[in-house]
């Protein structure tokens, strides 16, 4: 036994121990897909994990969802295994989000669901027996954007503002194969500028300054944001004989994993290969802790969550809204009374004119009668 082995304590084996524990227990990961229908959320999810996680909705079901005019929460669970490592995956979809003419407040049910998962975990964590905690806290939210001229639709911007306060938000440009490289570059710049100007919290991976290779990799991922993605579950044979996931068009083939065609690989890296544990850790140590502290400041131990309608701020806003409504009603009533008085005055004026005309007509009739009587007298 040499001197190095004699002085070896074993601290350096701690990462190996951690690796064994994680490998044995696996990891639970919850992903939310948010955005209007028709942007390829289901296709992307199945492409991301190289298996069918979610089934596509048929035309009848899509029409039924549109008729309901409500945002729903759909939960899909799956157990994935790769090289003896288990991933307990939960996918949260939001059918109906942003699909209606009036989409004001459509994000409220999504934010409420995210907060409910923090609330559920916090209440379970306060129980004596915490061995069977059900953790549904959402680790990442992919927000699918349809590019517009000014970068982001007002509804999407407002939704991302609220959602980003509770979850790791990752905006993506859906169906990138519909745009030219020039258009995509322009959309990316505009979207980034809008999000930065309005202070929307977009997830940024932690940079490891001590690992130059990993640092460059993460910097490359950040430079690609917002990710322009293409999804496909079909295998396509390229002219050079390769079989790839992609889409075939008359002008050529779009390869999903070709970085010159889209940012799918970079998005997969941030979600799975490079930053999944960072997403989980950020959720647990930052976002959940922030929610827990906020609730502890306004609640006693064991007290149920303050509902929106019981919130003092909400009541104040409700009272202000009631006052504004009352004032508006008063103004409208005053305006109506003034309008009514003008109508009455006009009616009275018209009635007076009408009476005067009746008097004139009577006088004319009497004059005619006198003239007739005078004419008859002369004839006699």
From Swiss-Prot:
User: GO MF terms on file?
Assistant: GTP binding; GTPase activity; molecular adaptor activity
> Which N-terminal residues, if any, form the signal peptide?
none
Per the UniProt entry, what are the Gene Ontology biological process annotations, in alphabetical order? cytoskeleton-dependent cytokinesis; mitotic cytokinesis; protein localization
Q: Which GO terms describe its cellular component?
A: cell division site; cytosol; medial cortex septin ring; microtubule cytoskeleton; mitotic actomyosin contractile ring, proximal layer; mitotic septin complex; septin complex; septin ring
What keywords does the record list, in alphabetical order?
A: Cell cycle, Cell division, Cytoplasm, GTP-binding, Mitosis, Nucleotide-binding
Which residue ranges does the record annotate as region G4 motif? Answer: 174-177
Protein name (Swiss-Prot/TrEMBL): Septin homolog spn4
What species is given as this protein's source? Schizosaccharomyces pombe (strain 972 / ATCC 24843)
Q: What is the lineage of its organism?
A: Eukaryota, Fungi, Dikarya, Ascomycota, Taphrinomycotina
Gene name of the record:
spn4
